[in-house]
């Protein structure tokens, strides 16, 4: 099996290189033209953060493959050339936490700093915010680790009577080694009072990962629960509300005139808000108005794109309309596939996690059977389900960002994504990726058993003092399913309706 172990190491290195190249590809194709040939530090953070996020998701399938690298699934320490998965997990998530709480905020403060200031002043301003955050986080982590940084494992004290060795070593049916009356170990019938609590202090890296997981789990429950429903249903409703035919030139001119008027109103409002920002009047009303302008701007861009789809121009107008029709058809197909995956996810959570004892291994058994068909087929399906949860988080964040005032909108658009939106979404992905891994390690516990991820997330995290009850009573899983159900009902009731064009835009006074 040594050759297989070496192959696993080589595959891991190749995958890391592919992930790094993919991150650069996403940055180059999604970045805004205004950020071309500048903002190199934020771009480095984006590429590095995306790579860490994708690698962390792929590490769980790698952990499962690593477990099988030894003959008869012997634990990894019993053979050579396997990956040190526990050390890799801790390293990845410590880097993850540093990026989320320190590096990405610094890059965002630096990027969004006043361009009229010198480079030194922008760095100084960003450092002040980050150092303040670092001091607060260090104090909170230190106090919590010192006071409640322990794990409480429930164990059962077992005791059994012993039998004396026989004086004669001539065994037969009438003279066995153990007497006929010794049918079971007496500890098997131990009473409930024999249960004890074994307390020990966890390591600091594991504690940091645990707290980061809690923060990520809250966001994952909210955004993921909403996104698991709105991701496929959003694609399906886009197909339902698609333009059915090309409009006339007069209709196009009328709609374009209205959109131009709306654009001038938004520009005037944005200029006014910029003047207020310069004067230091950044109160609650200012933030509310900024949110309103962002929302209207996104709606305006969506209306412009829709108008261009309904009235294609140029020599290839017919071809453009054909691609528009095919694009909406692709959205419908992807929406149906996504809906099947979302239903499978929610059903698996209910069947395997919320019902005690589980009704069925469900997706665990599917992955195992796929592995029997071809070695990496189950692993690939496993990775796909994990990645789908991350996509659901992004979709949920976008939907809630458009509906709720206190959530900032950071859309990701091909060729039009500013670096602050890139950084925000990378931070969200990194923070939620920890929770996605923990969630998958729990949801697919039967398939991912005896892995390093289960040791960290399945035992230590769920026994950590102060937060173990969140996992004991499935708080996050229940919240996830409830939000998914509410979002589904929302789309059934309102999602199919066409959006009404808003009237004249005005700032709140």
UniProtKB/Swiss-Prot annotation:
Pfam families: LMBR1 (PF04791). It is found in: Membrane. Residues 251-316 form a coiled coil. It comes from the Eukaryota. InterPro entries: LMBR1-like_membr_prot. Keywords: Coiled coil, Membrane, Transmembrane, Transmembrane helix. It is a multi-pass membrane protein. The chain crosses the membrane at residues 8-28, 44-64, 90-110, 128-148, 208-228, 332-352, 382-402, 422-442, 475-495. GO terms for cellular component: cytosol; membrane; plasmodesma. Belongs to the LIMR family. PANTHER family: LIMR FAMILY PROTEIN DDB_G0283707-RELATED. This is LIMR family protein At3g08930. It comes from Arabidopsis thaliana (Mouse-ear cress). The lineage of its organism: Eukaryota, Viridiplantae, Streptophyta, Embryophyta, Tracheophyta.
């Amino acid at each position: 099996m040594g050759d297989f172990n070496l192959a696993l190491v080589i595959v891991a290195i190749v995958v890391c290189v592919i992930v790094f190249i993919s991150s650069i590809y996403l940055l180059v194709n999604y970045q805004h033209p205004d950020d071309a040939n500048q903002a190199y530090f934020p771009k480095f953070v984006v590429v590095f953060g995306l790579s860490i996020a994708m690698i962390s998701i792929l590490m769980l399938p790698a952990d499962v493959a690593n477990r099988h690298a030894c003959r008869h699934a012997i634990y990894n320490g019993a053979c050579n050339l396997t990956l040190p998965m526990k050390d890799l997990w801790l390293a990845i998530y410590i880097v993850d936490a540093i990026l989320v709480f320190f590096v990405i905020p610094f890059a965002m403060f630096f990027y969004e700093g006043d361009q009229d200031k010198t480079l030194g002043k922008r760095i100084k301003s960003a450092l002040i915010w980050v150092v303040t955050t670092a001091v607060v986080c260090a104090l909170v982590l230190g106090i919590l680790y010192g006071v409640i940084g322990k794990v409480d494992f429930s164990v059962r004290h077992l005791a059994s009577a012993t039998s004396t060795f026989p004086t004669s070593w001539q065994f037969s049916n009438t003279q066995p080694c153990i007497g006929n009356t010794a049918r079971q170990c007496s500890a098997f019938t131990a009473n409930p009072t024999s249960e004890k609590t074994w307390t020990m202090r966890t390591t600091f890296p594991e504690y940091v990962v645990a707290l980061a997981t809690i923060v990520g789990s809250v966001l994952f429950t909210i955004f993921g629960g909403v996104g698991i429903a709105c991701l496929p249903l959003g694609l399906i409703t886009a197909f339902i509300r698609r333009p059915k035919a090309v409009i006339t030139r007069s209709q196009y001119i009328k709609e374009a005139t209205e959109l131009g008027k709306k654009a001038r109103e938004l520009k005037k409002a944005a200029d006014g808000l910029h003047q207020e920002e310069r004067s230091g009047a950044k109160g609650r009303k200012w933030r509310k108005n900024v949110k309103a302008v962002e929302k209207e701007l996104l709606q305006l861009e969506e209306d412009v794109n829709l108008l261009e789809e309904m009235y294609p121009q140029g020599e290839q107008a017919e071809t453009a309309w054909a691609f528009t029709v095919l694009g909406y058809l692709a959205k419908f197909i992807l929406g149906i596939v996504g809906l099947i995956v979302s239903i499978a996810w929610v059903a698996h959570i209910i069947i395997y996690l919320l019902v005690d004892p589980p009704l069925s291994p469900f997706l665990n058994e599917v992955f195992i059977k796929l592995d029997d068909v071809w070695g990496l087929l189950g692993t690939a399906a496993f990775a796909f389900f994990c990645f789908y949860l991350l996509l659901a988080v992004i979709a949920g964040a976008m939907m809630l960002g458009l509906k709720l005032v206190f959530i900032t909108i950071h859309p990701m658009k091909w060729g039009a994504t500013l670096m602050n939106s890139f950084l925000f979404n990378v931070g969200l992905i990194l923070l939620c990726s920890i929770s996605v891994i923990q969630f998958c390690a729990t949801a697919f516990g039967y398939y991912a058993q005896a892995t390093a991820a289960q040791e960290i997330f399945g035992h230590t995290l769920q026994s950590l003092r102060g937060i173990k009850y969140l996992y004991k009573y499935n708080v996050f899983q229940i919240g996830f399913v409830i939000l998914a159900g509410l979002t589904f009902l929302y789309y059934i009731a309102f999602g199919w309706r066409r959006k009404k064009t808003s009237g004249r835009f005005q700032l709140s006074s």
